[in-house]
Amino acid sequence: MAKTMMQDRLINPLEGAADAPDANIRPALLAEYIGQPVVREQMEVFIQAARARDEALDHTLIFGPPGLGKTTLANIIAREMGGNLRSTSGPVLERAGDLAAMLTNLEAGDVLFIDEIHRLSPVIEEILYPAMEDFQLDIMIGEGPAARSIKLELPPFTLVAATTRAGLLTSPLRDRFGIVQRLEFYNIADLTTIVSRAARLMRVPMSEDGAVEIARRARGTPRIANRLLRRVRDYAQVRGDGSINGAIAGSALDMLAVDRRGLDHLDRRYIEILHERFDGGPAGVEAVAAAMAEDRGTLEDVIEPYLIQQGYVLRTARGRVLTQMAIDQMV
């Protein structure tokens, strides 16, 4: 039940079926990529250098909170390198044969994108090591005493991996990535540009203050910004003339219970529980999760990152602690 509530949450940064239209408005090239200036500049250099040498780009690990554009960046890398993108995820690769099938279907210059790579099984990791280092695939033929190992040569390819939990990657896997990029929460100016661009592509008339209002409440996350834009568009059609300004955007988001800080009922409930049941902390994440009837992963991946980044909560060795700012503003 808690999982369903989280999935229905408007400002849930995890991707859902409702986000499918976003594929039509995602940037396709680095020149169109908004925000993350350090990552963008570095990737421009790395990609241009690899193309000039006619080599595959080094294997790339992208990590950071959900909804910041890891999949979008993987698509851009494939397009910029002129290869095809083959996508999968850690939980999907259950058997060695699953990964072997994907690797043997790659062509030179292709990009293999593995989302949630921290969820790979050890067996799959072992197959990846020689594939990443030497472009070789070791497979077993036969069973029992007659079984033998053979090596298959793979074309040069780039593994692009994404994770929200870089700390869960094993050292041998992490060390095999030549490029490691961390995506940060977006500032309001960059999110405003993203919202304005999306509205233009969706052919929704919108003023600058309308874009700013949506960006302010989007929790530093483009996926949430695009989702809020679609709901504000609905409100503008029904309660207005179809165009979005600051007042319309504010009224729509107030109706949707997303406040000016980008917080909703689950954020406020988290803070209330930490304040009332645990006297502001420190409190262990398992205890807070149990009190909210959520799982630990949901708190760590979905609720806490933005609260911590905004300075409402501290993550200490002894547990979670409310800051004075959270108490002053929300309790």
Swiss-Prot record:
**Compartments it resides in:** Cytoplasm
| Annotated DNA binding sites | R296, R315, R320
UniProtKB keywords: ATP-binding, Cytoplasm, DNA damage, DNA recombination, DNA repair, DNA-binding, Hydrolase, Nucleotide-binding
Q: Which residues bind Mg(2+)?
A: T71
Broad EC category: hydrolase
Which is one GO molecular function term here? Answer: ATP binding
Its primary localisation, in coarse terms, equals cytoplasm
Return the annotated region ranges for Small ATPAse domain (RuvB-S).
187-257
Report residue spans for region: Large ATPase domain (RuvB-L).
1-186
Catalyzed reaction equations: ATP + H2O = ADP + phosphate + H(+)
Cross-referenced Gene3D superfamilies = 1.10.8.60, P-loop containing nucleotide triphosphate hydrolases (3.40.50.300), Winged helix-like DNA-binding domain superfamily/Winged helix DNA-binding domain (1.10.10.10)
Q: Where is this region: Head domain (RuvB-H)?
A: 260-331
**So what family is this one in?**
Belongs to the RuvB family.
HAMAP family in the cross-refs: DNA_HJ_migration_RuvB
Role noted for this protein: The RuvA-RuvB-RuvC complex processes Holliday junction (HJ) DNA during genetic recombination and DNA repair, while the RuvA-RuvB complex plays an important role in the rescue of blocked DNA replication forks via replication fork reversal (RFR). RuvA specifically binds to HJ cruciform DNA, conferring on it an open structure. The RuvB hexamer acts as an ATP-dependent pump, pulling dsDNA into and through the RuvAB complex. RuvB forms 2 homohexamers on either side of HJ DNA bound by 1 or 2 RuvA tetramers; 4 subunits per hexamer contact DNA at a time.
Question: What name does the UniProt record give this protein?
Answer: Holliday junction branch migration complex subunit RuvB
Q: Which organism is it from?
A: Psychrobacter arcticus (strain DSM 17307 / VKM B-2377 / 273-4)
